[in-house]
A protein has these predicted regions:
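Glycosyltransferase-associated regions of secretory-pathway enzymes
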Residues: 1-142
């Protein structure tokens, strides 16, 4: 990837922060860090998703950098490249990385579904397996 900064979609509504990057001193990184000034980080067992930053970072991208929702590849102000979800997040033949969504930061026992999801995604090691996985997830390939 050759961009001043990059992020990808998690789903059609939200770019995500599991995988992102930027050159040194990029304003997008400063904007994300500024959000955390004066924030409390007490863990709430009853609302474990309360501090997940996907929505917050998406709002920064939409409001400050004119990102459009809808899982579309786009170039934003300050050279921020936004990739479709099949490049940096969800498994496909276009994947550079895969976000496994294991929820390791969640407290308590990991669920059976999360364990199965992790087991499957960790074995998507070649294009044949990605195509098979994508077929069953109803993702179309060219």
């Amino acid at each position: 990837l050759d961009n001043r900064a990059f992020v990808g979609y998690e789903n059609p509504q939200y770019p995500f922060t599991a995988v992102f990057g930027a050159e040194k001193n990029h304003p997008f990184i400063k904007d994300m860090l500024d959000y955390y000034d004066n924030k409390s980080f007490e863990f709430d067992k009853n609302n474990q998703y309360d501090k997940v930053n996907t929505k917050t970072v998406s709002d920064i991208l939409i409001e400050d950098y004119d990102c459009k929702i809808g899982n579309q590849e786009q170039m934003l102000r300050e050279g921020i490249k936004v990739y479709k979800d099949d490049v940096l997040c969800n498994p496909s033949v276009n994947s550079k990385t895969i976000h496994i969504f294991t929820g390791t930061w969640l407290e308590g026992n990991s669920s059976f579904v999360r364990n199965v999801n992790k087991f499957i995604k960790l074995r998507l090691t070649n294009k044949s397996r990605l195509k098979l996985y994508s077929y069953y997830r109803n993702i179309k390939f060219k």
